[in-house]
Regions:
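Hydrophobic, lipid-facing positions within transmembrane beta-strands of outer-membrane proteins
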Residues: 70-75, 87, 114-118, 145-147, ...
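Detector for outer-membrane/organellar transmembrane beta-barrel domains
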Residues: 228-316
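Outer-membrane beta-barrel "beta-signal"
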Residues: 39, 332, 357-369
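Outer membrane beta-barrel
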Residues: 33, 51-53, 82-99, 105-213, ...
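Sequence/structural signature of outer-membrane beta-barrel proteins
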Residues: 96-103, 136-140, 167-171, 176, ...
Length: 369
């Protein structure tokens, strides 16, 4: 049964507040940053997260995420993404099997490469000027995701990024099919061209980006996009907000996001609430609501159990069009830089639209370096 239009967003907000009140002390994906009190830049070359992992990120993955570490030479520190002081490289491979069960249709099963990417970091002036490249090499033709110059003066207190990059907005989730990433249109498939200014303080991380609004689709006269995101970070919790305005002659889109993360014992929580308003000349405006609440339980070395609830109201002008999605994913890292994922997702949507009521099962192999 689908909850009422406003009940689910209210549940998400209450969950955000509730987690803040019940949080207790505790000794690429955002939950790892939340669990450890890190910023995105702690583990990634990109200050806003995603893509290539830096030396610390690779060392953390090897020593903290893997069930055991395998080294040919026990005295060796192992691979850390750095070729030398001037060059760093990395990559991600994801592939496996998926099965989609849509009511009144035959099952759709397939196996293959989900996504394969390579990263190159050229440190022209170490710790000050970097040229960064993120290229998707499969499936299909090669696709440039990020290509930018990064200037980090004052020991990284300020950041200036120019080129093509992922926009700063909401949680940097690995799953691009999450409602908050899919409906906002800001995810790993939609980089944009422009300039981003960043500020990194001990407890704050903030970014302001001015881009041309293409999201990988080519420039339009009179079109531009502005993105603003800020996060306040504490060792056991964080809260942030984002704003995005896509100014387009064919219709403007304005988006607001409230997001955060909390630790409650062994579980790291993530939550996000998005309000999206589309204004189309001649058709008026419509509001879209999307939410996510996710818990990650690292119940043993090398093991993580992820459970997610999501709600989507694709249009406040229509009734009975709400959708829900429930996900359970087990992630296992038997050795360093190798992860297996097995998951199930159940969609609960509009009775007359079978695709919004589908079930998905997947098994994935993730290799990174």
């Amino acid at each position: 049964m689908i909850v009422s239009r406003f009940a689910a967003p209210l549940v998400a907000v209450c969950t955000l507040l509730g987690l803040t009140l019940i949080a207790e002390p505790v000794l690429a994906e955002p939950y790892l940053a939340v669990a450890n009190g890190f910023k995105c830049a702690q583990c990634h070359t990109n200050p806003t997260g995603g893509g290539k992992r830096n030396v610390f990120g690779m060392t953390y993955a090897r020593t903290q995420l893997a069930r055991r570490t395998v080294l040919s030479d026990e005295a060796s520190p192992g691979w850390n993404s750095s070729v030398n002081k001037w060059l760093g490289i990395g990559g991600d491979y994801r592939g496996g099997y998926s099965d989609v069960d849509v009511p009144r249709r035959s099952d759709d099963s397939q196996a293959g490469v989900t996504k394969s990417t390579v990263y190159v970091e050229v440190k022209a002036v170490p710790d000050i000027l970097t040229f960064y490249f993120d290229e998707q090499v499969s499936p299909g033709n090669s696709l440039g995701r990020e290509r930018y110059a990064l200037w980090t003066p004052a020991r990284g207190k300020y950041t200036v990024k120019a080129g093509q990059f992922f926009l700063p907005y909401g949680l940097r989730l690995q799953d691009d099919t999450a409602f908050v990433r899919q409906r906002s249109g800001i995810n790993f498939d939609t980089p944009d061209d422009g300039v981003e200014l960043g500020l990194e303080l001990p407890k704050w991380s903030a970014q302001l980006a001015a881009t041309n609004g293409t999201a990988g689709g080519g420039s339009e006269p009179g079109k531009d996009q502005t993105s603003l995101s800020a996060t306040y970070i504490q060792p056991r919790w964080r809260v942030g907000a984002s704003y995005n305005l896509n100014d387009d002659p064919r219709g403007d889109r304005t988006m607001y996001a409230l997001f955060g993360g909390w630790n409650t014992g062994p579980i790291a929580w993530l939550a996000e609430l998005d309000l999206i308003t589309d204004d189309v000349p001649g058709f008026g405006s419509r509001d879209i609501y999307a939410t996510l609440v996710e818990g990650n339980w690292r119940f043993g070395t090398g093991h993580n159990l992820k459970a997610t609830y999501e709600f989507l109201d694709p249009s406040d002008a229509a009734s009975e069009d709400e959708q829900e999605r429930y996900s359970v994913v087990w992630e296992h890292s038997p050795i360093q830089f190798l992860q297996t994922r097995v998951g199930f997702r159940a969609y609960n949507g509009v009775p007359g639209l079978p695709l919004t009521n589908r079930d998905e099962f997947f098994a994935e192999l993730h290799v990174y370096f």
